[in-house]
């Protein structure tokens, strides 16, 4: 078994009838790699930034936040017990209040639609008084 080595660099003679002239860095059109890169790669440009202000995503917020008779007490309590524990207590209080409203509606014979209206009214009053601050 004989090993043959072929060198592609400097192959200007037509030994085998090839039209390859140049080194490994040559492209199909005959240009070398550095010349081709300088033609195709443009210098990096700065990204265009819109002059318009980017709008923040609207968040569901209480319009009366920080207002109302009980708002300062609610804010101080939330800061003392922590946000997670405060939301748990608030959820329990809201659930208990909804149960009281439901029992009241049962005792006076109000239907479900009236009960829902009373719960919505309680929520609006809570917002105005600052319980949802």
Curated annotation (Swiss-Prot):
Keywords: Chloroplast, Disulfide bond, Electron transport, Membrane, Plastid, Thylakoid, Transit peptide, Transport. It is a peripheral membrane protein. Disruption phenotype: Normal green leaves under continuous-light conditions. Not able to grow under fluctuating-light conditions. The kea3 pgr5 double mutant combines the phenotypes of the single mutants in non-photochemical quenching (NPQ) induction upon overnight dark adaptation. The double mutant missing DLDG1 and PGR5 (dldg1 pgr5) has a pale-green phenotype similar to the dldlg1 simple mutant in continuous light, and a partial compensation of the growth impairment of pgr5 simple mutant under fluctuating-light conditions; higher NPQ than in pgr5 but lower NPQ than in dldg1. One of its GO terms (molecular function) is electron transfer activity. The gene is PGR5. Disulfide bonds; Cys-11 and Cys-105 are probably involved in the formation of disulfide bridges with 'Cys-300' and 'Cys-303' of PGRL1A. 'Cys-272' and 'Cys-275' of PGRL1A may also be used to form the disulfide bridges, but in this case the cyclic electron flow is lost. It comes from Arabidopsis thaliana (Mouse-ear cress). Interacts with PGRL1A and PGRL1B. Induction: Up-regulated by drought stress. The keyword Transit peptide applies. This is Protein PROTON GRADIENT REGULATION 5, chloroplastic. Belongs to the PGR5 family. It is found in: Plastid, Chloroplast thylakoid membrane. Critical for growth under fluctuating-light conditions. Involved in the regulation of the cyclic electron flow (CEF) around Photosystem I. Essential for the reduction of PGRL1A by ferredoxin and for photoprotection. Contributes to maximize photosynthesis efficiency after a long dark adaptation via the regulation of non-photochemical quenching (NPQ); acts independently from DLDG1. Promotes the induction of steady-state proton motive force (pmf) and energy-dependent quenching (qE).
């Amino acid at each position: 078994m004989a090993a043959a080595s072929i060198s592609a660099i400097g192959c200007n003679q037509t030994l085998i009838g090839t039209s390859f002239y140049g080194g490994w860095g040559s492209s199909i059109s005959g240009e070398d790699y550095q010349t081709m890169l300088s033609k195709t790669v443009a210098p990096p440009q700065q990204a265009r930034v819109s002059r318009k202000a980017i709008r923040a995503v609207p968040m569901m917020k209480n319009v009366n936040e920080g207002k109302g008779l009980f708002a300062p007490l609610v804010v101080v309590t939330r800061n003392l017990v922590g946000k997670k524990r405060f939301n748990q207590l608030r959820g329990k209080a809201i659930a208990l209040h909804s149960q009281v409203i439901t029992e009241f509606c049962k005792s006076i014979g109000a239907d479900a639609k009236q009960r829902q209206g009373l719960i919505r009214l309680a929520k609006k009053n809570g917002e105005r008084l600052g319980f949802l601050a």
